[in-house]
Amino acid sequence: MPLTWKDSGLRWYWVVVLVFLADQLSKQWVLANFDLFESVQLLPFFNFTYVRNYGAAFSFLSEAGGWQRWLFTIVAVGFSSLLTVWLRKQSASLLKLNLAYTLVIGGALGNLVDRLMHGFVVDFIDFYWGKSHYPAFNIADSAIFIGAVLIIWDSFFNSQSEQDKTEEVK
């Protein structure tokens, strides 16, 4: 018998909504309060700096001429759809994987909306040391990164033992 939404990982979809809203609200705040490249120092190693990212992580393909917008749109929709199908098929009790998948989906959808609305992703979190700046990023990027780390962690350390525990409960 297929899992109901309450019993499946779809029960965790509230994380997608939370990440998406936090990401979009923070980006709207930046767009309303900052000029492009404007920077406000918050700590001696941390700024809010409004930049536009036409590429992917670390501005990968940002100078590609525009076609990458549609490639990244297809990738975001594809991965979000795939992870949603996986959430539907797995137990709600797989905490780490469900959290990981929903973080990635929320982040992917947050950046997808930027690409579709603006043609670029709004980045503003700027960490630096001296004159060396880490590439600016946003809440969606952070969620995707944390989700990816959790997926990798789970694949090396926990997936089989958590699956065994879930099957024992049934």
Swiss-Prot record:
Main location per the UniProt record: membrane
A single GO molecular function term of this UniProt record: aspartic-type endopeptidase activity
Source species, domain of life: Bacteria
Active site residues of this protein: D123, D141
TM region(s), chain numbering: 12-32, 67-87, 93-113, 137-157
Keywords linked to the UniProt accession: Aspartyl protease, Cell inner membrane, Cell membrane, Hydrolase, Membrane, Protease, Transmembrane, Transmembrane helix
Pfam families tied to this protein: Peptidase_A8 (PF01252)
Localization per Swiss-Prot or TrEMBL: Cell inner membrane
The protein's Enzyme Commission number: 3.4.23.36
Pathway: Protein modification; lipoprotein biosynthesis (signal peptide cleavage)
Membrane topology: Multi-pass membrane protein
Enzyme class, spelled out: hydrolase
Reactions catalysed: Release of signal peptides from bacterial membrane prolipoproteins. Hydrolyzes -Xaa-Yaa-Zaa-|-(S,diacylglyceryl)Cys-, in which Xaa is hydrophobic (preferably Leu), and Yaa (Ala or Ser) and Zaa (Gly or Ala) have small, neutral side chains
A GO biological process held by the record: proteolysis
Entry GO CC: plasma membrane
Its job: This protein specifically catalyzes the removal of signal peptides from prolipoproteins.
Family: Belongs to the peptidase A8 family.
NCBIfam families xref list: lspA (TIGR00077)
Protein's name in the database: Lipoprotein signal peptidase
Originating gene: lspA
